From Swiss-Prot:
EC number annotated for this UniProt entry: 4.2.1.10
Quaternary organization: Homododecamer.
Functional pathway: Metabolic intermediate biosynthesis; chorismate biosynthesis; chorismate from D-erythrose 4-phosphate and phosphoenolpyruvate: step 3/7
Alphabetized NCBIfam families for the sequence: aroQ, PRK05395.1-2, PRK05395.1-3, PRK05395.1-4
Protein name as it appears in the record: 3-dehydroquinate dehydratase
């Protein structure tokens, strides 16, 4: 198993810090990437940090990391609620998958309450702000140490 965590971000997360800051905060995706790299380094892990607005690019990344990586942290954005294709890709994973949402999706619009991603996720984090990414990486390190989910 290699020591790289895939941190995968879906549509519109490239606008983090600019789009609806009252919901998502003012931190940018670059800030989140720095947080992820710093957190992972503390556990001897590396991060491959990606964002795409294209569903096929997210699927390709999942396929690339589904076996042999340290795990996947995914914030699929709006695809969380719509993408059976992402679910199918995640169901092929032999590594832990942590679903991460900046906002508490369960306190928002009803259509956001359903997640296809959760059906394949080892664990789910929502509503912790961007700190949720660090918690997700810590949890992957916890799982790698042989502790149960």
């Amino acid at each position: 198993m290699n020591d790289t965590v895939l941190v995968l971000n879906g549509p519109n997360l490239n606008l983090l810090g600019k789009r609806q800051p009252e919901i998502y905060g003012r931190e940018t995706l670059a800030d989140v990437e720095a947080l992820c790299r710093e957190t992972a380094a503390g556990f001897g892990l590396a991060v491959d940090f990606r964002q795409s607005n294209a569903e096929h690019a997210l699927i390709d990344a999942i396929h690339e990391f589904r076996v042999g990586s340290a795990g996947i942290v995914i914030n699929a954005g709006a695809y969380t609620h719509t993408s059976v294709a992402l679910l199918d890709a995640l169901n092929t994973c032999e590594v832990p998958v942590i679903e991460c949402h900046i906002s508490n999706v369960h306190r928002r619009e009803a259509f956001r309450h359903h997640s296809y991603i959760s059906l394949a996720a080892t664990s789910v984090l929502a509503g912790f702000g961007t700190h949720g990414y660090a918690l997700a990486i810590r949890h992957l390190a916890h799982l790698r140490a042989g502790r149960p989910a």
